[in-house]
Amino acid sequence: MKKIVILSDTHGNLSAIYSIYDILLESDMVFHLGDHYDDMNEFEGVLGDKLYRVYGNCDFGRDPKEILVDVEGVKIFATHGDLYGVKRTATRLIERAKGLGANAVFYGHTHCAEIKEIDGITVINPGSAERYSTNKSF
């Protein structure tokens, strides 16, 4: 089983990323789900090809906005979430995941951590590592 770290909405809070530096190094995969994509630039060298990133709404029109990754036969759809209106409902996000044949969805944008299952799809939002967020994060 792979050890996966999921980050989102770091918004320049590099100290939050450094606080889990050892965990990042020990992991098999690291996903950053946007806002601010560039926060992970200085970790690229040590994480190499185990770093997967998508751009968020604060990353100003860059791509990719979403990726589909196969992890030991499990298809993971990773996106920031803003394109799917996730602050209101997860309906469009789940429909996209189904269309891609995904078993799991990783998304951010809401700054609210959650893990749930919808229509047989595991849905994970890690919350925000942003220093001023009052919402819980994993």
Which residue stretches match the model-derived regions?
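Short glycine/proline-enriched coil/turn segments at helix->beta-strand junctions
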Residues: 25-29, 46-50, 74, 101-102, ...
